[in-house]
C-alpha cells in the first residue's frame, strides 16, 4: 500500500475540505481519466483496490497512472477507551481530494475498455466520479 517514507510530524489535524482542486485537474499523461465530483478522503487501501481492478480488467494492455498519493495520517484510539488521554496512534493513510481532481489515467486502450476499467475502479471509492477525455491545452 502507498504511504510516505517519512513525514515531519506523525499526527495531523483533520483540516478543511472547502474549494476545488488546485492541481491535477486535467488529463496530462494518458488519454482518458477519472475525475472526482465530490470532496473526501481516499484511503491507501481504496487506491490499491482501484489499481488492481483497472489492471485486472485491462490485463497486459495499456498503461495506468495513479495521480493521487495518501500523505495524510489518520489516527485512531483503541476500542473501549475512555475519552481524553491524548490523540490516538496513526492508523492509516488517506489522500484528501476535492472536486475536479484526476485520480487515475489510462492510455493505449480503446475508449470502451478505458470506460469499463475506470467504472470498475470507481465502484471501489466512496465518492462520485466521472470519465473524462484528454483535451489539448494551449
From Swiss-Prot:
GO cellular component: cytosolic large ribosomal subunit
SUPFAM superfamilies: Ribosomal protein L16p/L10e (SSF54686)
Keywords: Ribonucleoprotein, Ribosomal protein, RNA-binding, rRNA-binding, tRNA-binding
Listed Pfam families: Ribosomal_L16
GO molecular function, one term: structural constituent of ribosome
GO biological process, alphabetically ordered: translation
Family named by the database record: Belongs to the universal ribosomal protein uL16 family.
Function: Binds 23S rRNA and is also seen to make contacts with the A and possibly P site tRNAs.
Subunit structure: Part of the 50S ribosomal subunit.
Protein's name according to its UniProt entry: Large ribosomal subunit protein uL16
Gene: rplP
Amino acid at each position: 500500500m502507498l504511504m510516505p517514507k517519512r513525514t515531519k510530524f506523525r499526527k495531523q489535524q483533520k483540516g478543511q475540505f472547502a474549494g476545488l482542486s488546485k492541481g491535477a485537474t486535467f488529463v496530462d499523461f494518458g488519454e482518458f481519466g477519472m475525475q472526482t465530483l465530490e470532496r473526501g478522503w481516499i484511503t491507501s487501501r481504496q487506491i490499491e483496490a482501484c489499481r488492481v481492478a483497472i489492471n485486472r480488467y485491462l490485463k497486459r494492455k495499456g498503461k495506468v497512472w495513479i495521480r493521487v498519493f495518501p500523505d495524510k495520517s489518520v489516527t485512531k484510539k483503541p476500542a473501549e477507551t475512555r475519552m481524553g488521554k491524548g490523540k490516538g496512534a496513526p492508523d492509516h493513510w488517506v489522500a484528501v481530494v476535492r472536486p475536479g481532481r484526476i485520480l487515475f489515467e489510462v492510455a493505449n486502450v480503446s475508449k470502451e475498455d478505458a470506460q469499463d476499467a475506470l467504472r470498475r475502479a470507481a465502484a471501489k471509492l466512496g465518492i462520485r466520479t466521472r470519465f473524462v477525455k484528454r483535451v489539448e491545452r494551449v
